[in-house]
Amino acid sequence: RKKSGIVRGADGNPIRGKWSYDEDNRNKLPKDISIPKFPKINETNHTKKLKPIVEKLFKDHPGSTENFWLATEFDDVVKLLNFFIKEKSNLFGDYEDAVNQKDNILFHSALSPYINLGLITPEFIIQKVLEFHKKNKIRMNSLEGYIRQVIGWREFMRGIYQSYSEEMETKNFFKQNRKMKKSWYDGTTGLPPLDYAIKNALNYGWSHHIE
């Protein structure tokens, strides 16, 4: 943010005097809260043709195409981004760290797969968020929290993978020699939070950052 000037005043300091509102991002999800549902994206003909091929060629790989939910075209990703900005972003900060089995995405944008695949860029996302904020004023803990996740944590982890991926994949820092049991791959460990996270990854190929 210092380099880019995002959410900073003319004097160079953060707007409202704080770089981080992380302490305001840990609220418990109320039982009666209504969570906006992302619009369903229609599958393209390419997706429909590829799904049976994937099931055939990668049948031994984790996961399934049965719950495929991702957009595959830029215009559809922009629709999801706009929906997040208008319907979810204002409460993103409050419940950023909340996890609840009633909804695996909650108030997150779930745009990381599209960034990873190159369908959309962090710059484009931040630009759209800030444009909306100028007219509609997203709450600061949500605005700062979301920007921190996109240009901070997401880009930081991307840099780690780019620089150290081979080392991370091949080194055994803790000198472990036992194999993971099957339950760690199908979500039957008997620990509900862990099993929920594993099954989410298997079903959707996406995980909440707290998971």
Residue spans of the language-model regions?
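Beta-rich, aromatic/charged-enriched effector core domains that present basic-aromatic interfaces
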Residues: 1-73
